[in-house]
């Protein structure tokens, strides 16, 4: 061990050792408890960012800790390699997506290795390789055969810039989540997987995920959106047509005064045949904002169709309107409007001067003035004929039953969740394994013709997918008949929905999964990723697992037992106004700042002298140019320091503020540990510690050591509060640096303490701990060392500090043996000057003793 801590010397040396010894390679071993720790796989964008580093450091710390508990730990890594960014980069760099992607993977793989992550690299998967997507295509054809896949023309969210379909979740404020272009509505044929068949199970099984964040489960519950209600059929006046609506409030049915239908509803099309104004309005609706958040806040617009529905109970005519807030994709494409008891319906009725009727009393039990505001609470019914006087639940059931008896109603459970549209009109994705025969029949590509390989040597024009532009690529033969291949590719969420299972058997060539390997490792014990994936990836991830279970590929119901959603990494952001009024963002690395006495930034300039506006801490991003390159930090401080800072700066689920001064602090701490280990080990071997023959000071330090082990074990294992675990080790280190080293027992105790400190830090700072363990003469290598065990007896205090009160007021404190009697403590307390003066000339009427904590003398 060298005297100075130089990570640039030791880290490559330790990483080479891991590589040569294949330290983290694992196989199935039924004699050991397994532990599968997984961080969400990265997209190979070109360089790691600090968000990656935080995610993967958390995963590596958990994995290394579990190894030290003696478990058979799988920690794999791979690449979510398909996707739009590769197409944009290929056009920009005049190349194809494949070489750009593979080059990025190689570079980022090197970055991961320099950070010391303990991956089993033999299990690496790259989702854009035929070896991977072969089995995805095969599974899709099996789902098709089971009736879980279908194709239909549907109205979709269309990004005119990326020329592709967006899921509702990918529309943010009416714009594309990726490029911010305004989203349009478009009718195109799409492939869908029936996730709605699993809606109830996806919802109910959330209850079994006890170690998932409640926030994620709530987001999924809301997205699935289960509701119980009634489907009501109206007759259309002067027509043979019927109109069906779904409502969760049948108790308000007597207050329905109009019906709103979607622009794509058959009745809307029928009404528009001789109405050019309605045609124009329907066209406007097709390009309206489509995300649900937008639906809630946008201006409500409508137009009368001139048609009327017949109210099923009152037989009154209610007008049918086309409204921009009703979508064909949700429910029946029509809603009954009760403006007296629904805010949206009320706004619409007020705007267009439609009737508003009250049928629910207000919270005080009075008849409300619904022309001023709607009453949306579930109160007592009135003005509802035979149903007046019923409460919400009774009214719901009575009206529902009546409609069912009349044959115009049907109780129904509805879900907000829509089927998963998996078609994308881009090139860089896995080809959808379907084909169309000359007679128009659509068939799956047979298993012996899979995979349908995506050509990688292509020219990108940035507009048309190369496989759509090349008519020859689509030509194929299915069972001897000419056919045309599907030229759409899979949504990239397909690849990331099952990669975790493929890690268990990455080289298996007889099917999607090797059931023996998959069922040894699955479910994942610990999954780590951002909260932003709660309702897309994490929903599809759960859905795919259930599909694989029902195909007898896995035995478990859920893919992951425990989920940790790490917070974002924030950094200072600065800009100045350019010549054309635009914001020019300046990297924190290129700024000079002045701070006040509280450390707050009060002035900032860049290296060219521009005075900068400081906008505070925000998520590291390219748009604000405030990303910090992990590579530069590793080169400057070493991987262990970066890892230590990431784990210490904040609890893992909260945002982390990047402060280089704090990184320097982490580096100083590591140097302090290194120096103490060096000084201790350079004095030679120590004798075994005799715990039966310790001085009072040695006992105190021994007790502190084992209390620290207990706390760190709980913080890392159960609480995942890594920052407080590190703080506890730092506190112990402060005591160790002050501990006397005069006797053999002193040195033996220091040896035991440092062996424990190095083991507790090794999941976080593995390179330095590898070397320090060797220097201390630790048994075997640190990579096979056991986690230190807390000695329960050692943690018991020999003495207690007892608070002394007189008439309930604190007057002193005394240190007593842990087993001291009330009489002993009383006698000792009476001799304390601070207590004794309050006992002069008074009578002690009562003595209250809480053993080891408090003595209260009641005097009078």
From Swiss-Prot:
The family this protein is said to belong to: Belongs to the class-I aminoacyl-tRNA synthetase family.
Alphabetical list of InterPro entries matching this protein: aa-tRNA-synth_I_CS, aa-tRNA-synth_Ia, Leu-tRNA-ligase, Leu_tRNA-synth_edit, M/V/L/I-tRNA-synth_anticd-bd, Methionyl/Leucyl_tRNA_Synth, Rossmann-like_a/b/a_fold, tRNAsynth_Ia_anticodon-bd
E.C. code: 6.1.1.4
Pfam families (UniProt xref): Anticodon_1, tRNA-synt_1, tRNA-synt_1_2, tRNA-synt_1g
Lineage: Bacteria, Pseudomonadati, Pseudomonadota, Gammaproteobacteria, Enterobacterales
Origin species: Photorhabdus laumondii subsp. laumondii (strain DSM 15139 / CIP 105565 / TT01) (Photorhabdus luminescens subsp. laumondii)
Record-level GO BP terms: leucyl-tRNA aminoacylation
Disulfide feature: none
Name by which UniProt lists this protein: Leucine--tRNA ligase
Short motif 'HIGH' region, span: 42-52
Catalysed reaction equations from the record: tRNA(Leu) + L-leucine + ATP = L-leucyl-tRNA(Leu) + AMP + diphosphate
GO cellular component, one term: cytosol
